[in-house]
Amino acid sequence: MIKLNPTSNPKNLIQTLSKDESFIVLQKLFRENPDLEKVICETALKVVSNVDAEKISNNLYNDLLSLDVDELYARSGNGRYGYVDPNEESWVMFEEVVEFYIGEMEKHHQRKLPHIVKEYCIGIINGLIKFSEEANTEFSEWVEDAPLDHIDYVIDCYEKTKPEAKDLDQIMSNVEEL
């Protein structure tokens, strides 16, 4: 068995583990110490529960703002597989960003954390509204209608999680004010 050098700092070893190595260590601890399950789950819940709609909204808005018209031009036009319409490709790029956030919302649904799912839904919708109202980039001109068009899609995804009626009503009342 390999041992840590007595002069080494154990914290340094732990802090320098890659994500994959950390995951392997956690799985091994979990298997070898079933009594740690509760502590590990509580800690994981604290980590994944650190979510709020405003932060999600701002992150989505910033991610959408970072979409680059030069990348759009590089991904569209004549190419090896034929012509790619820049209008269509701009929507594809927009949807790729939004889909990441919807995927996060669905991940929390799989974890059975409905309060976080609701925060994600609210955050995504607010981020789309903010982008629609405030974005003034060359790229945003290509997707003028996309933000508001995607709100219905976000709500459809949220409805698939079977939220409580009061939560859905709250989201719908916010959207109806548009």
Predicted regions and their residues:
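Eukaryote-biased, non-catalytic alpha-solenoid scaffold regions
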Residues: 1-12, 24, 31, 35-178
